[in-house]
Regions:
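A glycine-rich, hydrophobic loop/mini-helix early in the fold
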Residues: 37-69
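Charged phosphate-binding loop/patch that engages nucleotide di/tri-phosphates or the phosphate backbone
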Residues: 156-177
Length: 177
């Protein structure tokens, strides 16, 4: 029997992220079709990044550390609306989202065009309230802690988080030069 998640209706997109149809999530994943997802990096005023550890009940990458919030973009939904929905569903927060970049669909992203949003600075020090159906645990990490653990134990993190975090850090460091 298909789960509720597998029955969610998502847009199927092409390599250039243009909508070409809609299909149930389970079918999209089985057929490895391009679709859309969002990730949110939530920073506190000290510059630490909140990561969540995915529920063991998740079909994809259970128990691995992941972005502050992430999920699929529903059929007809915008990237920004999906990011706001996931932030609220997974860690109980509403915040102003800043788009950072979008990565093209690839194997590491799970065949998903993924848009990264950032929430940072003052006012973001409210404690996230992880949804126990979505998240085992969550906490703020110093960037150096994440980098050290990624180099030592990459499999502790979801492939899409590894991809997004590395690109994010490359862009941040490039902006500092």
């Amino acid at each position: 029997m298909m789960t509720h998640e597998e029955l969610e209706l998502l847009d199927v997109v092409d390599a250039d992220d243009r909508v070409i149809g809609a299909m149930e999530r389970g079918d999209i994943h089985r057929k490895k079709l391009f679709h859309r997802s969002v990730h949110v990096f939530l920073f506190d005023s000290a510059g630490r990044l909140y990561l969540q550890r995915r529920s063991l009940a998740k079909a994809e990458h259970p128990g691995r550390w992941d972005s502050s919030a992430s999920g699929h973009v529903d059929s007809g939904e915008s990237y920004e609306a999906a990011a706001a929905r996931e932030l609220e569903e997974e860690i109980g927060l509403e915040a102003t989202l800043e788009p950072v970049f979008k990565i093209r669909a690839c194997e590491d992203s799970g065949m998903e065009h993924s848009m990264l949003f950032r929430v940072q600075g003052r006012g973001n020090d409210r404690s996230p309230q992880p949804n126990p159906q979505e998240v085992i645990e969550g906490r703020f990490f110093r960037i150096e802690e994440i980098e050290e653990r990624l180099s030592r134990e990459p499999e502790a993190f979801s492939p899409s988080f590894r991809l997004l975090f590395r690109r994010y850090m490359d862009e941040v460091r490039g902006a500092e030069d």
